[in-house]
Amino acid sequence: MASTSSLALSQALLARAISHHGSDQRGSLPAFSGLKSTGSRASASSRRRIAQSMTKNRSLRPLVRAAAVETVEPTTDSSIVDKSVNSIRFLAIDAVEKAKSGHPGLPMGCAPMAHILYDEVMRYNPKNPYWFNRDRFVLSAGHGCMLLYALLHLAGYDSVQEEDLKQFRQWGSKTPGHPENFETPGIEVTTGPLGQGIANAVGLALAEKHLAARFNKPDAEVVDHYTYAILGDGCQMEGISNEACSLAGHWGLGKLIAFYDDNHISIDGDTEIAFTENVDQRFEALGWHVIWVKNGNTGYDEIRAAIKEAKTVTDKPTLIKVTTTIGYGSPNKANSYSVHGAALGEKEVEATRNNLGWPYEPFQVPDDVKSHWSRHTPEGATLESDWSAKFAAYEKKYPEEASELKSIITGELPAGWEKALPTYTPESPGDATRNLSQQCLNALAKVVPGFLGGSADLASSNMTLLKAFGDFQKATPEERNLRFGVREHGMGAICNGIALHSPGLIPYCATFFVFTDYMRGAMRISALSEAGVIYVMTHDSIGLGEDGPTHQPIEHIASFRAMPNTLMFRPADGNETAGAYKIAVTKRKTPSILALSRQKLPHLPGTSIEGVEKGGYTISDDSSGNKPDVILIGTGSELEIAAQAAEVLRKDGKTVRVVSFVCWELFDEQSDEYKESVLPSDVSARVSIEAASTFGWGKIVGGKGKSIGINSFGASAPAPLLYKEFGITVEAVVDAAKSFF
C-alpha cells in the first residue's frame, strides 16, 4: 500500500541512517545483501554510501561471520503484509491522536518486525494468554506500547478490543500508557523504565532453559519456546541492559532473540549527541550472535532471514539490529525526535495517510487484514491442544517429573511443604538471621520444585547457597544456584522475569541491604508487576560494624515500607525468619524483602511462625485487662533490646508488653479488633526501637510515643560500640519508658 513518495522517503532516510552508521565504528557488521523486498529500491548514491561504509569498517577490525544469505520464501502475500503493517501503524497513530498523548514513532518504525513476529513466527493461543508453552514477547521500549496493543488486537486477544484502543491512556482502560502485565492479558511483563524489559526477557529465557533442562526427555520436549524482545537506543544506554545481557551471553540463552530498534533518535535529538559506541561489537563481546538488518522499514525478507538464522544459533542469544526510521511514513516528522513522544497532529496524520496510501477511517482495520489474522485463533487452539496431548503422554511415562512440572506451571505448592521449615526454642544456639535464613532456603529447596536463586557475588556473606544443588551455568542449566556476579540491578529484573514466567517459579536474590540502592528500580517493578520475588537482604544495620556507613543501611527500611505491594520483613530470630519465608513463598503476587543480621542473635521466648503471619504480635506481657503501663515495640536485632528493657522495667514494678513488629504491611491487613489487642488505643506510653531511620514510626507509637533509632549515617567501628554511641541500648529504652511515669 506504500505510495511512490513514501518509498522514496523511506530510502532517503534509510540511506541517511546507514551512512550515519558509517560515520563511526557502529556499522561494522556485515548485513544481509541480495534480498529484495516488495518496493525496496535503494538509490545509486545510497548503495555507494553503504559500500563506502563497509569498506571503511573493514579496515577497522576483522569481519565477523557474515549472516547467512538466502532467498526466503515469504509465508504471506506481500500485499497483505504491507496492508497489515500499515494497519498496525495507523492503529497506533489513531490511538495516540485520540488520547492526545503517547509515542507513535516506535510503532510506526517497528511495525514490520513486529508483524512478522506475531503473524508468522510466534506460537501463542489468543484465547488463552497463559498457555504455558507459548512464546514470550517483551516490549522493552515500553513507551511504544501501542505497537503491542495493536498486535494483540489483530491477533484476537479478548483483552484488547477496538474500544480498548480508543480508550488508550484513559482511566480504567486495559491500554495504559506503558505495558502492564497485571492489567492486560497477553502482556508478559511490565515495562516502561528503559532496560527493565530486556532484563525481564533474560529472566524469561533463563526460566525456559532451566525447565527444559530439568524436564525434557529425548522422546518428549514439553518445554520448548522462545523469548523475543524489542529494545531501543534508550534501553541500550541503561546500565541494567548491559548487566542482564552480559549474563544472557554467559549463560548461553540460545532461545532469547532480541530486536534492537536502531533508529538513531532519542528524546533530546540524534543519538550522536550521547551514544556513539559500537553496539554490535559490545554484544559480540558479551557472547551474543549479532545480525544487522539494514532495511527495517520494508525489508520483510531480511527480517525473516535474520530470525531464521537466529534460530540456528542454539548456544548463545541473538541480537538482531534492525535499522528503522522512527515515525516511518510521516512526511514531515519521520526520523526526528518530535515523533517520539507526541501525537502527530491532525494535519500530519492526514499527510501520513496520503503518503502511505491509507484510505481507511481511524481505528478501521480492513476486512482482508482481519480475515488474514483471524487464523491465529484456531491455530493457537490447535497448538495448545497438541501440546496438552504431548504432556498427557509425558505424564503417563514420567509421572514424577510431570508432577513437579505441573506444580511449577500452576503454582500449587506440594502438600505439607511448610513443615520443612525449621523451628527453634529459646534453648537453641543463637545465630545470625542470615545463617538462619540459609537453613530455611535449603529446607525449602528440597520440597518446593520451583525454588531457585542466588546472590550478587555475595553468596558466602548472604548465606544463600543451596547446598543440595549445583550452579546454573551454560552446561548445567538444570541446577538452581544462580551466580549473578556484581550486577544487583540486572539480578532483580532477571528474577522478575523468572517469577512471571510461571506461577510456581519462586526466585530469590541476595545482596547487602544497603545495595538495594543499586536495584531499587527492579524492586519497584516487582511490586508493580506483582512478581513474587524474595529479596534476601543481609547486613541490615550498623550491626555489620567496621565496614562503615557506606555499607550500613539507615533509610532503607522506611523507604520499602513506603513502597506499595511490598512486604518488608525484619525478623528477630529463627522462628521469625522461618515465618517470613512461609509468608514469602505463599505471596506469589507480592515481593518480600527480608532484612537479616550479620551479628548473632538469641532465639527469644514468645516468637513464632504464626505471630509473623500477623505482622505484629505480643511476645511477652505481664499486664492485665489489655492495659500495660508501657508497650515496647522492636524489630530484628532490637527486639532483644526491647525484651531486656522490659525485664528492667518489670523489676521496677511496671507492667510491660513487648511487641514484635516484624512486618508492618501484614499488621495493617489485620482486623481492627486484632490491632486493638496488640496496641490498645488507650495506652499512649509506647516506645519503638529499631537501628534505622525513625521515619514512619509515629503512626505506630502515636503522638505521645517515643522512637529510638538512627537519623544520621553510621560509622566505622565494632558493632557493640556503634550501638552504644548511637544510643541503641537497653538503657535508652528504659529511660524513654520512664519518661511516661
UniProtKB/Swiss-Prot annotation:
Induction of its expression: Up-regulated by salt, sorbitol, and abscisic acid (ABA).
Pathway: Carbohydrate biosynthesis; Calvin cycle
Alphabetical list of NCBIfam families matching this protein: tktlase_bact
GO biological process, one term: reductive pentose-phosphate cycle
Name this protein carries in UniProt: Transketolase-1, chloroplastic
Pfam families: Transket_pyr, Transketolase_C_1, Transketolase_N
Cross-referenced InterPro entries: THDP-binding, Transketo_C/PFOR_II, Transketolase-like_C_2, Transketolase-like_Pyr-bd, Transketolase_bac-like, Transketolase_BS, Transketolase_CS, Transketolase_fam
Residues at which substrate binds: 103, 340, 434, 461, 539, 547, 598
EC number(s) on file: 2.2.1.1
PANTHER family: TRANSKETOLASE, TRANSKETOLASE-1, CHLOROPLASTIC
Enzyme class: transferase
Residues at which thiamine diphosphate binds: 143, 192-194, 234, 263, 340, 488, 515
Site label Important for catalytic activity, positions: 103, 340
Known partners and oligomeric status: Homodimer.
Keyword list, A-Z: Acetylation, Calcium, Chloroplast, Magnesium, Metal-binding, Phosphoprotein, Plastid, Thiamine pyrophosphate, Transferase, Transit peptide
Subcellular localization(s) per the UniProt record: Plastid, Chloroplast stroma
